[in-house]
Structures are given as structure tokens and as C-alpha cells.
Regions:
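Juxtamembrane helix-capping/reentrant segments at transmembrane boundaries
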Residues: 19, 77-96, 117-133, 224-239
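Transmembrane alpha-helical segments that form the membrane-embedded catalytic/substrate-channel core
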Residues: 59-72, 98-101, 147, 198-224, ...
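Non-catalytic, topology-defining segments of multipass membrane proteins
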Residues: 1-61, 68, 94-198, 261-294
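Active-site-proximal inter-transmembrane loops
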Residues: 158-163, 226-248
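Membrane-water interface at transmembrane helix exits
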Residues: 41-45, 69-74, 78, 107-110, ...
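Solvent-exposed interhelical
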Residues: 255-257
Length: 294
């Protein structure tokens, strides 16, 4: 059964139950997440024993805020639209990723998932197919270059990408300009501690996010069926928490309107129909790089 056939089996009551959003669930998850950031950040700030090692988990926590911003593009983490917007824009600053721009980019990705020439995630961003490309992918060099060019391009460029509605160009330009001004002010006035609490950890943590994201569509068929072009990865509760349940990624692509806390329920309903399932990220990674030896 493909994802469209599955959706036809759901009645109105099923859909309403799955699509029910909650400010309480979203805020509770966010508070726990911020508490974890507070612990790792305090450890670094007060230079507690082995604080240098703590830079890595702190950076992973910052980098994985990407998954919350990703959810905010769908307005699903919280019931209140303004909470999704505020969270999305705050994370935009931390990750150098404009929220409004990312929303249109990501919605196009959902519309044309894994279809070459249509999915913007595939435009100039081929999945690594050799050790050299894999190392470069994890180094995040391409990520940082892309974010710099997006910020500058959105602020002064023509904004001609097909996924950007013409009527939104002014908003995207204003967003990019405001972010650039904010970065100039912050980096000109912020204490050195900010470097160790934000930039250095983010650089160290981003490779983990890149490896995680590779599992979502890497080596999946270039077809329209979300149960085949997207991978669900069975993993630990810690990773599920860190990624806001996005390892249930095929389920998310089949029903993007389902909030993170309902994805485990949706997984139980779709498990028998999923065509791409990996038993953990380590197994996925080993299987992925094994082809490099051929």
C-alpha cells in the first residue's frame, strides 16, 4: 500500500485525532530541551571538569534545534501559530537559516520529495557517494557556504527560486537584512564567552545533524510514494527526544500536518506499509558507507 492509499483508509475521526496539536505538549518538550541546553551551557560557562568535552553535546543540542524549526514550518509543534513563528525565527538566528525562506524551501521539498529537478534539497546537494564526498558532507563546509550565500542572496539578490512566491520576496529580503544586521551587532558587541557557548559548539555538533539528516532520504528511490522515498529510522528515546520524533520521517512526509507527539501513533498505523526502515543510525551509516568500498 502506498501512502496515498493509506490516507484514503483514514476516516475523519482518525485524522482529527492525529492532527490534534497542543501548546502544552510542545512547551513541555521545549522546556526539557532548554533545560538540557542549560545544563551543558552552564558546564561550559563555569569551566567545570572536562568542559571542553561538553562542547560536543552542547553543540549537538543547538544543531538539532533544526528539527524544531523544521516542524515550525508546518506549524505543528504548538497549537498557537504565534508560538511556531517565534520559535522558528529564534532558531533561524542560532542556525543562520532564515525561517521564512526555509518554510518555502521545505514545503517545495515536501511537494516534490526526492524527485530530481523538482526537489530543492537535491538541487546542487547530491548525497555523498565516495569517502571524499562523505567527509566533505560531514565537515559542513557546504552547509556554511550555502547559508552565507542564502543570506546575502536573499538580502540583495533577485530571489528567483521557483519555490519562492513572488508576493513574498519583500518579506524574505527584509528577513535576510534583519538577520545580517543582528549578526553584525551581536558579533561586534558580544563577549568572548558567546563564541564558546554558541559558535564553537555549533561547528562541532553540526556533523552529527548532517549524518542524521542523511538517513531521511539517502539511497531511497526517486518515486512519489512517501513510504518509499523517505526512510523511518528506529532509534532510542534520547534521539527521538532530540529530533522531536522526526526519525519517524516517512510518517511525517505522509502526513506533514501531524504534530511530533502524534507520530509514534501514526507509526503504529503505518509500520506494515513502510518500504524504507533502518534499525538505528549506526546500522544505516554502516550500510551507507559500505558501498564506498566497491
Amino acid at each position: 500500500m502506498d501512502h496515498k492509499s493509506f490516507l484514503k483508509t483514514l476516516n475523519a475521526k482518525d485524522k482529527a485525532r492525529l492532527n490534534a496539536r497542543s501548546d502544552v505538549r510542545g512547551l513541555c518538550h521545549l522546556m526539557l530541551y532548554c533545560a538540557a541546553l542549560g545544563v551543558t551551557g552552564s558546564w561550559i560557562h563555569f569551566a567545570l571538569p572536562m568542559w571542553q568535552i561538553m562542547l560536543i553535546p552542547h553543540g549537538i543540542l543547538i544543531a538539532f534545534l533544526f528539527t524544531l524549526q523544521h516542524e515550525c514550518t508546518h506549524n505543528t509543534p504548538f497549537r498557537s501559530l504565534w508560538l511556531n513563528s517565534v520559535a522558528g525565527h529564534l532558531i533561524a538566528f542560532l542556525l543562520f537559516q532564515p525561517f521564512l525562506w526555509f518554510r518555502y524551501f521545505h514545503l517545495a521539498h515536501h511537494k516534490y520529495t526526492n524527485i530530481p529537478g523538482k526537489d530543492p534539497e537535491l538541487d546542487g546537494h547530491e548525497k555523498p557517494s565516495s569517502w571524499g564526498a562523505f567527509v566533505r558532507h560531514l565537515s559542513t563546509i557546504d552547509y556554511w557556504w550555502a547559508k552565507i550565500t542564502i543570506l546575502i542572496g536573499n538580502s540583495v539578490g533577485p530571489l528567483t527560486a521557483s519555490y519562492i512566491p513572488p508576493r513574498k520576496r519583500r518579506s524574505l529580503r527584509a528577513e535576510a537584512v534583519l538577520l545580517i544586521v543582528a549578526y553584525v551587532v551581536v558579533f561586534a558587541t558580544a563577549p568572548t564567552a558567546l563564541l564558546w557557548l554558541w559558535i564553537v559548539p555549533l561547528i562541532l555538533g553540526f556533523p552529527v545533524l548532517r549524518l542524521y539528516l542523511l538517513a531521511e532520504h539517502g539511497r531511497c528511490p526517486e518515486v512519489e510514494d512517501m513510504f518509499l522515498n523517505t526512510r523511518t529510522t528506529l532509534t532510542t528515546r534520547i534521539v527521538q527526544f532530540l529530533a522531536w520524533n522526526m526519525p519517524y520521517h516517512a510518517e511525517h512526509h505522509a502526513m506533514p500536518s501531524v504534530p511530533f507527539h502524534k507520530l509514534p501513533t501514526l507509526h503504529k498505523m503505518t509500520a506494515l506499509h513502510l518500504g524504507q526502515v533502518s534499525d538505528g543510525y549506526s546500522k544505516f551509516s554502516k550500510a551507507y558507507v559500505s558501498s564506498f568500498w566497491d
